[in-house]
Amino acid sequence: MERCRSGHHRIISYYLSSSLILFWCIFVLVLLSTTSTTNALVKIPKNTTVPAVIVFGDSIVDAGNNDDMITEARCDYAPYGIDFDGGVATGRFSNGKVPGDIVAEELGIKPNIPAYRNPNLKPEELLTGVTFASGGAGYVPLTTKIAVGGIPLPQQLIYFEEYIEKLKQMVGEKRTKFIIKNSLFVVICGSNDIANDFFTLPPVRLHYTVASFTALMADNARSFAQTLYGYGARRILVFGAPPIGCVPSQRTVAGGPTRDCVARFNDAAKLFNTKLSANIDVLSRTLQDPTIIYIDIYSPLLDLILNPHQYGFKVANKGCCGTGLIEVTALCNNYTASVCPIRSDYVFWDSFHPTEKAYRIIVAKLLDRYLNRFF
């Protein structure tokens, strides 16, 4: 803004009124904010624009939306964020960047996707994307209640509506529609439903079978994607569940003395993924628009876990934080838990969430496999 004023101030002021100067500066700011600000690693076709990355879901893509909440599902303290910019704990459930950040970086949009509820969020950040995701969220309403304070998906949509209104105030309705239509929407959810709801609460298993519960999850996921489509989104990635039975905490709790992957947890994840994939296919055919895509995250993460050395990892059955067996959120802290010296040796940061290195490998694979379906 200052550069706009200082370089040509005398000439501009001679020809234009101060109000027009202000308008011109705001226009330039908006233009720059909706143009790639980092070098794109993923090549997209010429004349194709991806102005923003907009994210919904759970702790995998939360960037700090829970930071001011009274909840166990928050991590705005060290050692979380030890490898993030400046070594700051922002509320990301990892040692560094999370998938939303990496997607935006790979597309050349910006280095990080900020949390929508960050009180220090700059207005121009809205133009290039935010995350509404919240640790503890799930497709089944009960799941978020278990987290005591997480933001359920319906509330994430309410924040999204608020976000749209803010965009309209900044750039007008026409530009807002363009941003929503051409942005990449990322939805990652489902792990908490299976691990923290179905397999943790006996009353849930009295009411549902694994088949009926995963069907409920898949139906709610389809409804969520359809709602985003109704808001004008046309590039929607809906991620399936990961191999939950192979994350360190679940191996510790239910994997027996040898901490094996828990087959029934993985089977539930695969069943959900099958139902979700079918639901997304039906939705795409119903809308006659193939711009809602199911993303298989199960296979690439499982490959890292089963074949860590092929990707430069040394440890895949424990997290880097503490003993690596059970530490997550409050148990992963600077007072009672040490941190492994070489984070890049580990697939998992804590007992539930991967390291930035693991996320980077997975995101690169997924973008290479799926992104061209939009263009």
UniProtKB/Swiss-Prot annotation:
Superkingdom per UniProt = Eukaryota
Q: In this entry, which stretches build a coiled coil?
A: none
Q: In which tissues is it expressed?
A: Flower buds.
Q: Which residues are glycosylated?
A: N47, N334
Q: Which Pfam families match?
A: Lipase_GDSL (PF00657)
Q: List, alphabetically, the PROSITE patterns matched.
A: LIPASE_GDSL_SER
Which residues does UniProt mark as catalytic? S59, D350, H353
Listed transmembrane segments: none
Q: Which GO terms describe its biological process?
A: lipid catabolic process
- What molecular function terms (GO) are annotated for this protein? lipase activity
The kind of enzyme this is, by top-level EC class, is: hydrolase
> Where mainly located?
secreted
Q: Which UniProt keywords apply?
A: Glycoprotein, Hydrolase, Lipid degradation, Lipid metabolism, Secreted, Signal
Please state where this protein is localized. Secreted
The signal sequence is 1-40
Q: Does the keyword Lipid metabolism apply?
A: yes
Query: Which EC number(s) are documented for this chain?
Result: 3.1.1.-
Q: Name one GO cellular component term.
A: extracellular region
The record's similarity note reads: Belongs to the 'GDSL' lipolytic enzyme family.
Name by which UniProt lists this protein: GDSL esterase/lipase EXL1
Organism this protein belongs to: Arabidopsis thaliana (Mouse-ear cress)
